[in-house]
Design a protein with these regions (language model features):
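Walker A (P-loop) phosphate-binding loop of ABC-type ATPase nucleotide-binding domains
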Residues: 37-42
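ABC transporter nucleotide-binding domain
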Residues: 168-257
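Conserved ABC transporter NBD signature motif
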Residues: 27, 58-73
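C-terminal coupling/interaction segments
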Residues: 242, 246-296
Length: 296
């Protein structure tokens, strides 16, 4: 089966800065992916490359088996919703929704109307007069109602309050069940979307440092908690992603413990606690950044 997205050694440079650096990924159809990373890690640049809005410095990109650059047959199957979306100054919400079918063949006007009601949007208000939350809600509606086979959300929902964000997650999951497609969510709100994500791509300094199913990733790292001496003995010779403590109590984040090692830790009086996806992302990017600084 041909992947929806396939890249090989994809690189985008701005002068001496490699915003995307040697990225090789494959994304399958009908899955929800999380594209995670810190500010400036390369998330938006990568999505801009995949949607034909940026030109690669080197490497290859295939979307639906061919290049997305100036390719109408590909781009009409793609929806890219981003926080910095721009509209004509005189556009109202109703104009955005009326023009959407020109770009998205699978547009569902009834679903869009239901979402307008859900988010309580004023259809006759100009886009430039909207609050940040209302502006974000318009992007969410377009992304969902487009039903594009490949849909990118580049943090357009940051302006939404907690209730509205949960509404977005609920509507996304429900509609995805009825109308499967490939969805890529780029967000800093990792714990909020963790249960939606089937696969995680973690990018740092332009490089993909994690490309793994979410369930596999969650089980790959654990916190080992206990007395300092016991934790130090257990973690000796192991990769420790992070360690902190208060007084004599220490917590060390370690990766890839076998069942036998987990049993040995408990027999040594140590407690094993789960690491959330957000904590894992923080620990992995901290570790990668430290390695980069040491090699610089």
């Amino acid at each position: 089966m041909t992947p929806v997205i396939h890249t090989r050694d994809l690189t985008r440079r701005y002068g001496s800065l490699a915003a995307v650096n040697g990225v090789s990924i494959s994304l399958d159809e009908n899955r929800i992916y999380g594209l995670l990373g810190r500010n400036g890690a390369g998330k938006t640049t990568l999505m801009s490359l995949l949607t034909g809005q940026e030109f690669a410095t080197s490497g290859d990109i295939e979307v639906f088996g061919t290049s997305p650059v100036e390719n109408a047959a590909v781009l009409q199957r793609v929806c890219f919703i981003k926080e910095s979306q721009r509209y004509p100054d005189d556009f109202k919400i109703k104009h955005v929704l009326r023009s959407a079918p020109w770009f998205f063949p699978n547009w569902d006007p009834d679903f869009a109307a239901a979402l307008v009601t859900d988010f309580n949007l004023p259809l006759n208000r100009k886009m430039k007069k909207l609050s940040r939350g209302q502006f974000s809600a318009v992007g969410v509606i377009v992304g969902l109602a487009s039903r594009a086979p490949l849909t990118f959300f580049d943090e357009p929902y940051l302006g939404l309050d907690a209730v509205a964000r949960q509404l977005f997650y609920d509507r996304l999951l429900a509609d995805y069940a009825d109308h499967p497609r490939t969805v890529v969510l780029s967000t800093h709100l990792i714990d909020e979307v963790a249960d939606l994500l089937e696969h995680v791509l973690l990018i740092d300094a332009g490089r993909i440092i994690v490309d793994a199913p979410t369930d596999e990733l969650r089980g790959s790292v654990v916190n080992v908690v206990g007395g300092r001496d016991a934790v130090d003995r257990f973690t000796a010779g192991r990769e420790v992603l992070h360690s902190d403590g208060i007084g004599g109590l220490v917590s060390a984040t370690v990766s890839r413990l076998t069942d036998a090692e987990r049993t040995a830790a408990r027999d040594a009086g140590l407690e094993l606690t789960a690491v959330s996806l957000q904590q894992l992302v923080v620990r992995l990017t901290e570790s990668t950044n430290n390695e980069f600084q040491e090699s610089a």
